[in-house]
Amino acid sequence: MPTINQLIRKGREPKERKSKSPALMGNPQKRGVCIRVTTMTPKKPNSALRKVARVRLTNGIEVWAYIPGIGHNLQEHSVVLVRGGRVKDLPGVRYHIIRGALDAAGVEGRRQGRSKYGAKRPKEGGKK
């Protein structure tokens, strides 16, 4: 434990916070190009085929990004917008692709939580 004099001389040094999404380099989103679009299996006890893409960002860093929602139109060379946010049961996936931006189309037929999936407002009198 330091003395008062030592604290006056040197002071406390704040701990540096480690970023949870370092590839974005402090930006809210980054653009990237899909290198590979594939599926991954989650950790135990979950079971599924989660849709993911290997994306090369504009700063040259390659990351795995999750493709949210049901169905997608992404393929190799698609240009996408990537945000931070990990997928808990997919190790190594620390980013999400933003639906409805650039080449990633919004989710078709989505009625609730539409803004998160880039879905337009459905026409009135459509099917229930």
From Swiss-Prot:
Record has Cell membrane as a keyword: no
SS bond list: none
Keywords recorded for this protein, A-Z: Methylation, Ribonucleoprotein, Ribosomal protein, RNA-binding, rRNA-binding, tRNA-binding
Cellular-component GO terms for this entry: ribosome; small ribosomal subunit
A GO biological process held by the record: translation
Superkingdom of this protein's organism: Bacteria
Example GO molecular function: tRNA binding
Coiled coil segments of this chain: none
Positions of the UniProt region annotated as Disordered: 1-29, 106-128
Pfam families, alphabetized: Ribosom_S12_S23
Ribonucleoprotein keyword on record: yes
Signal peptide: none
Recorded family membership: Belongs to the universal ribosomal protein uS12 family.
Assembly mode: Part of the 30S ribosomal subunit. Contacts proteins S8 and S17. May interact with IF1 in the 30S initiation complex.
Entries under HAMAP family matching the protein: Ribosomal_uS12_B
Protein name, as recorded: Small ribosomal subunit protein uS12
Gene that produces this protein: rpsL
